[in-house]
């Protein structure tokens, strides 16, 4: 179902009796959002407003929103906490996450019985231990790890690292990487928190990360050491919308 299609989404609410919604439906490529902002504003915000409106109408009480650490913009200090002020986002993608958080906050404040949690992901990474679920995207990857693994497997000739002139120890961007299994467990815990009414407020925010930043080069070198191989990579210019560290 296209969640931008209100009529189609309404039929889902009419057919199924569910109390909680986890909202993942969004485009997420920072660079693409800079080139095609309207695509991101339409898909990421119109769909979310449809979900919120129907939850209000049908009396569905719990919504978990997939947010992002991009809402912190270019933070002044690391690590960021939930009390760190949001700063202007550096991309339309980040803007959509900030705006959706505001929408959810306002809806939870206005509509009695509606509860929401926003999980601010840092950088999901890895695969399920079964190896049956992992990062092998169709088309062009939007995350670093698939580029690394595809380069290692010979599917890509070279790995591009965007910028080595940032004010970081090795000049490449710093990111906080969170294992996807831990991220999945965080969603289960958040839904349980809502359904068991353990929330302190109708709307809450939680960061989902480790608190330890790793540079792009550190990740590449770590992959090389763990697998006993050398990756073919090159340094290219900075990518629009990227922040130095988060």
Residue ranges: model-predicted function:
Residues 1-20:
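Conserved Rossmann-fold cofactor-binding substructure of NAD(P)-dependent oxidoreductases
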Residues 12, 40-41, 55:
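A hydrophobic alpha-helix adjacent to the NAD(P)-binding/active-site core of NAD(P)-dependent oxidoreductases
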Residues 18-24, 65, 207:
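Rossmann-fold scaffold of SDR-type NAD(P)-dependent oxidoreductases
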Residues 23, 49-92, 107-117:
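Conserved Rossmann-fold NAD(P)-dependent oxidoreductase catalytic core, especially the SDR/UDP-sugar
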Residues 41, 89-98, 134-146, 176-177, ...:
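Short-chain dehydrogenase/reductase
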Residues 74, 90-127, 146-156:
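Active-site Tyr-X1-5-Lys
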Residues 145-246:
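C-terminal substrate-binding subdomain of Rossmann-fold SDR/epimerase-dehydratase oxidoreductases
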């Amino acid at each position: 179902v296209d969640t931008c299609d209100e009529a189609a989404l309404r039929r889902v609410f009419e057919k199924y009796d569910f109390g909680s919604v986890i909202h993942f439906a969004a485009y997420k490529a920072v660079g693409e959002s800079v080139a095609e902002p309207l695509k991101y504003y339409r898909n990421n915000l119109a769909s979310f407003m449809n979900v919120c409106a129907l939850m209000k109408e049908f009396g569905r009480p719990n919504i978990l929103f997939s947010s992002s650490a991009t809402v912190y913009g270019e933070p002044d200090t690391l690590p960021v906490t939930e009390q760190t002020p949001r700063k202007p986002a550096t991309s339309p993608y980040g803007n959509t996450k900030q705006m959706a958080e505001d929408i959810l906050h306002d809806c939870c404040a206005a509509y009695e019985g509606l509860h929401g949690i926003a999980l601010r992901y840092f950088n999901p990474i890895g695969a399920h231990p079964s190896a049956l679920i992992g990062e092998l995207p169709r088309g062009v990857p939007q995350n670093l790890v698939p580029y690394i693994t595809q380069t290692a497997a010979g599917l890509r000739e070279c790995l591009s690292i965007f910028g080595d002139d940032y004010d970081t120890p090795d000049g490449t961007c710093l990111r906080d990487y969170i294992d996807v299994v831990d991220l999945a467990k965080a969603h289960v815990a958040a839904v349980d928190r809502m359904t068991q009414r353990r929330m302190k407020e109708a709307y809450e925010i939680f960061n989902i990360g480790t608190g330890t930043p790793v540079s792009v080069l550190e990740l590449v070198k770590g992959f090389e050491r763990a697998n006993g191989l050398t990756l073919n990579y090159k340094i290219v210019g900075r990518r629009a919308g990227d922040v130095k560290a988060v």
